[in-house]
Amino acid sequence: MKTKIKYLRQEMGITQKDLAEKVGVSRQTINALENGKYNPSLLVAYKITQLLNKEHIEEVFVFEDEEI
C-alpha cells in the first residue's frame, strides 16, 4: 500500500515522532507506513487520516490492486 503520509505530515510541519504519539504507535511504525512496508489497521488508518486533516482515507492511503 502506498501512502501520502510523509508529504502531508511534512506539509503540516509534523515529525514522525509527533504523529506516532498522537496516533498511539511507534515512530518506527510511521516510518514503515511511509515506506510502504506496513499495512495499518483500519483504526490506525482512520486516526492518521483525521490527524492529517483529511476526510477520506483514500486521500492518505492509496490501495493497490492485489490478486485474491
Q: Residue locations for each model-derived region?
A:
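Recognition helix of helix-turn-helix/homeodomain-like DNA-binding domains
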Residues: 25-38
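Short, basic-rich loop-to-helix N-cap that marks the start of a DNA-contacting helix
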Residues: 37-50
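Short, charged recognition helix plus adjacent turn
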Residues: 50, 58-68
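Short basic helix-loop element that most often maps to the first helix and adjoining turn
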Residues: 3-22
